[in-house]
Regions:
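Ligand-binding "clamshell"
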Residues: 11-14, 129-141, 203-206
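Sec-exported extracytoplasmic/periplasmic mature domains
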Residues: 49-53, 70-75, 93-97, 113, ...
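Extracytoplasmic ligand-binding site segments that recognize negatively charged/polar headgroups
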Residues: 1-113
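Periplasmic-binding protein-like
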Residues: 86-95, 133-157
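Alpha-helix capping/helix-boundary segments
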Residues: 108, 126-127, 177
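Conserved C-terminal helix/tail region of periplasmic/extracytoplasmic solute-binding proteins
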Residues: 110, 213-248
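A ligand-binding cleft/hinge motif common to bilobed small-molecule-binding domains
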Residues: 113, 119-136
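Mature extracytoplasmic/periplasmic domains
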Residues: 147, 151, 156-218
Length: 248
């Protein structure tokens, strides 16, 4: 496994979980519509650029949307500072009131593959699929930072068949299972050899940079669970969506 998916805050000793996918959140964009210089200059603030009004997708996730807003403002996505969270809320309200975004979930994948919007917030694995389907699409991670995430398998304490569960985890982690899983959905495998083979010469995702998570940016973070902040952000995101519906 890659070092980047080991020793994470939720399992620092790697005792309870086995990662199988990992990646980032970033911006998928149509290279025929979006100037890369705009992305490099504005980062997430491109979602406030009137040039792209009515031509953007937001992802219906309070966690990722607030990550985007907080990073656009120069803050940590793990902040519990009330004033910073309020600023991020105001940023998102400004976005939905002035930019007329479409707030979506998984439909962003096929829609961006078909070039229906100029840009959107997306998971790197979904961006890999989009770019694999449409060569006019690109993936950009702002220098201000992003969420570096991983998906992992765990076994509940009350599991009825832990031996079978361990066997499945072993299968999903070994080369063949990990290769099939990653190549089918486009999400980056935590298995080093699988990742190398899928990205390398002749691989399914050869040359698609979205498939290679960024590991060298000091502003990238792993989410830390905070129950109170989670509740607050969830409530504020509901208000953002109400503001969006009232605007539309």
């Amino acid at each position: 496994l890659y070092d980047a998916v080991k020793g994470l805050p939720y399992d620092p000793e790697n005792e309870y979980s086995v990662p199988y996918f990992w990646g980032t959140v970033g911006i998928v964009y149509d290279k025929t519509k979006v100037d890369i210089k705009d992305l490099e200059k504005e980062g997430y603030n491109i979602f406030l650029d009137q040039k792209y009004k009515g031509d953007i997708y937001l992802y219906d996730s309070e966690r990722d949307s607030f990550m985007m807003a907080l990073k656009a403002l120069g803050y940590s996505m793990n902040t519990s500072d009330e004033s910073q969270i309020q600023e991020a809320y105001n940023w998102l309200v400004q976005c939905v009131q002035t930019m007329k975004p479409e707030i979506v979930t998984d439909e962003i994948i096929d829609n961006m593959a078909q070039g229906r919007k100029a840009l959107g917030l997306i998971y790197s694995g979904d961006a890999t699929y989009v770019i694999n389907e449409n060569e006019n699409m690109g993936y950009y991670m702002p220098e201000g930072g992003t969420n570096q995430w991983s998906d992992a398998m765990v076994i509940p304490k009350n599991a009825k068949n832990p031996e079978l569960a361990h066997a499945f985890i072993n299968y999903a982690s070994d080369y063949d299972g990990a290769y099939d899983n990653s190549s089918y959905v486009g999400y980056t495998s935590a298995n080093k050899k699988v990742m190398k083979d899928l990205y390398g010469k002749g691989g399914e995702f050869e040359g698609i940079d979205a498939y290679i998570p960024r590991t060298d940016n000091k502003n990238d973070e792993v989410f830390e669970y905070n129950e109170e902040t989670k509740k607050e952000i969830s409530n504020l995101w509901s208000k953002v969506k109400i503001a969006a519906s009232n605007t539309n």
